[in-house]
Structure formats: C-alpha cells, structure tokens
C-alpha cells in the first residue's frame, strides 16, 4: 500500500494531499512523478523513524530522479538517516554528494560541522589534542560556509566560532 494511504499524522496527511494535487496539475513526466512519490514516501517513513523503509524509498527515488537539485535533497535525507544511525562517515559522504549537486544547502554544511565537532570532542576525550584541533578546524570551516549562506542562522555555531577564535 502506498505510504500516502497509511499516514496517521495530520501534517503527513496534509503534505500527501498537497503533493498529490501538485503532481496532478504540474506538467511532469511519469518518471518524475514516480521519483517524487518515492521521495515523499521516504520522507514520511523517515519522520516515523522507519529508516530502512525510508532508505529503500530514497534509493528508488535516486534511481528515477534526473534533476541534480532534486537529487541533492534525496542525498541530504539519506545523510540524515546515516547521521541518526551514528554512521558518520557514510553521512559525510552523502552530504558531500548533496553539496556537489546543490552548493546552497546550509543544513548539509551544518550537519557536516556537527559531525566534525563531535569527532573533535571524541579526540579530546581520548587525549589526542592534535587530532581534536584538526576536527574542530574542519567543523569551523563547514560552519562558516553554512553561516555565509544563511547569516541569521546557526547562532550557537557563530558563538562557538567567536569563543574559540575561529570567527573571521
């Protein structure tokens, strides 16, 4: 059964209804409609914590979707799932791939920075200050890119950059 028929929450139902209307009125190919249906179902499964189902839908959407911009959001969402699962190396790979197709995804830069910062903290706990500093510097670079795209966002990151002397 398509996920759009089993969504229980109001927001998911509303999104599904609006998406179905748009799919009917906007001139798109059958493949584009099918790709969007998989993407929509992936987002729905992801919001419910059904990551395996979400990944299946996203991979199918990637197989069908040809637009680089749309593919960037699919890749970004795959990265989110890997982040949630603690698979940080895979997550970074998918965020990079998303940014290759759409360099205006501040949320991807932010998530990459968060992962690098986390790895820096891990290195501190392990007593490796040199590795920690490298991770923190990489986090700073990603946060600077996110902030450059959306200057009013990521206030905590901006504060961290200032406190640590990494804000230019």
Curated annotation (Swiss-Prot):
This is Photosystem I assembly protein Ycf3. GO terms for cellular component: chloroplast thylakoid membrane. It is found in: Plastid, Chloroplast thylakoid membrane. TPR repeats lie at residues 35-68, 72-105, 120-153. The keyword Repeat applies. Essential for the assembly of the photosystem I (PSI) complex. May act as a chaperone-like factor to guide the assembly of the PSI subunits. Belongs to the Ycf3 family. One of its GO terms (biological process) is photosynthesis. Keywords: Chloroplast, Membrane, Photosynthesis, Plastid, Repeat, Thylakoid, TPR repeat. The lineage of its organism: Eukaryota, Viridiplantae, Streptophyta, Embryophyta, Tracheophyta. It is a peripheral membrane protein. It comes from Citrus sinensis (Sweet orange). Its main location: plastid. InterPro entries: PSI_Ycf3_assembly, TPR-like_helical_dom_sf, TPR_rpt, Ycf3/AcsC/BcsC/TPR_MFPF. SMART domains: TPR. It holds the Pfam family TPR_1. NCBIfam families: PRK02603.1 (NF002725).
């Amino acid at each position: 059964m398509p996920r759009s028929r089993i969504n229980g929450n109001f927001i998911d139902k509303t999104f599904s209804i609006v998406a179905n209307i748009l799919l009917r009125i906007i001139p798109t190919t059958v493949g584009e409609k099918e790709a969007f249906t998989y993407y929509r179902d992936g987002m729905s499964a992801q919001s419910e914590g059904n990551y395996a189902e979400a990944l299946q839908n996203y991979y199918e959407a990637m197989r069908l979707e040809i637009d680089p911009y749309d593919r960037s959001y699919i890749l970004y969402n795959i990265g989110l799932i890997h982040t949630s699962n603690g698979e940080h190396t895979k997550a970074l790979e998918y965020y990079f791939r998303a940014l290759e197709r759409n360099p205006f995804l501040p949320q991807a830069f932010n998530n990459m920075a968060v992962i690098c910062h986390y790895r820096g903290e891990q290195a501190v706990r392990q007593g490796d200050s040199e590795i920690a500093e490298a991770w923190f510097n990489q986090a700073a670079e990603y946060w600077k890119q996110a902030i450059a795209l959306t200057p009013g966002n990521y206030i905590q990151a901006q504060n961290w950059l200032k406190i640590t002397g990494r804000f230019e």
